[in-house]
C-alpha cells in the first residue's frame, strides 16, 4: 500500500471544495494542499504564466513526495494540464475530465442537452471545458460565460450578500433554459 499523500493544487482557496470531497470519498488518505493565494487570481493571467505557475506548484508538491497530484483549479486545468502532465512521473489529473464524464453518462440519450459553464474569463477563453464537452457529448449545446468577479469575491468571503447576489444574477442572465450549470472554477 502506498502511504504517500495526495497533492492538491489551486490558485487560491477554491480548491478546498475539492479537498473536502476527496476527504469524504477517501477518508484514510493524507492530502497536501497548496493554495497559491500570493499570485491569485490566475484567470486574468496569460497561458504561459499559468503553465509556469502550475509547474511551480507541482514542483512543490513533488518535493512533498506525493503519489498523485490533483489540479483543483479550473483555470490551471484548462490552460496547463495538457502541457504539464507528461513532464512528471507522478500522475496528474484535473477537474474537467471527471465532471464531463459524469455529464456524458447523464446526457448519453439526450440529443438536446443544453449545458452552461461559468468560470474565469481565462478558463472560458481556453475552451478546455467546451472542447471536452464537445468530445464526449457532441450534440450538446453549450453556453459559456466568463465571470471575472466571482473568484475574487469568493476569496474575500463575499459569498452571501447583496453584491454577490446581484453579480451572480447578472452573470446568469444568459443561462436561461439550460439543463446543467457547470461551475468551471472551484471557487
What spans do the regions from the language model cover?
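Non-catalytic structural scaffold of enzyme domains
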Residues: 1-186
Amino acid at each position: 500500500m502506498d502511504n504517500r499523500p495526495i497533492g492538491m493544487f489551486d490558485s487560491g482557496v477554491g480548491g478546498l471544495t475539492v479537498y473536502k470531497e476527496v476527504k469524504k470519498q477517501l477518508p484514510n488518505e493524507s492530502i497536501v494542499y497548496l493554495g497559491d493565494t500570493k499570485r491569485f487570481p490566475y484567470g486574468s493571467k496569460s497561458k504561459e504564466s499559468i503553465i509556469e505557475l502550475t509547474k511551480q506548484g507541482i514542483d512543490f508538491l513533488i518535493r512533498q513526495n506525493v503519489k498523485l497530484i490533483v489540479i483543483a483549479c479550473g483555470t490551471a486545468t484548462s490552460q496547463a494540464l495538457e502541457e504539464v502532465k507528461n513532464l512528471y512521473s507522478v500522475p496528474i489529473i484535473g477537474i474537467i475530465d471527471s465532471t464531463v464524464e459524469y455529464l456524458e453518462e447523464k446526457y448519453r440519450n439526450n440529443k438536446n442537452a443544453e449545458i452552461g459553464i461559468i468560470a474565469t474569463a481565462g478558463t472560458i477563453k481556453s475552451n478546455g471545458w467546451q472542447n471536452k464537452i464537445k468530445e464526449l457529448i457532441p450534440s450538446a449545446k453549450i453556453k459559456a460565460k466568463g465571470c471575472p468577479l466571482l473568484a475574487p469575491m469568493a476569496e474575500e468571503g463575499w459569498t452571501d450578500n447583496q453584491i454577490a447576489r446581484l453579480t451572480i444574477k447578472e452573470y446568469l442572465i444568459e443561462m436561461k433554459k439550460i439543463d446543467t450549470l457547470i461551475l468551471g472554477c472551484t471557487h
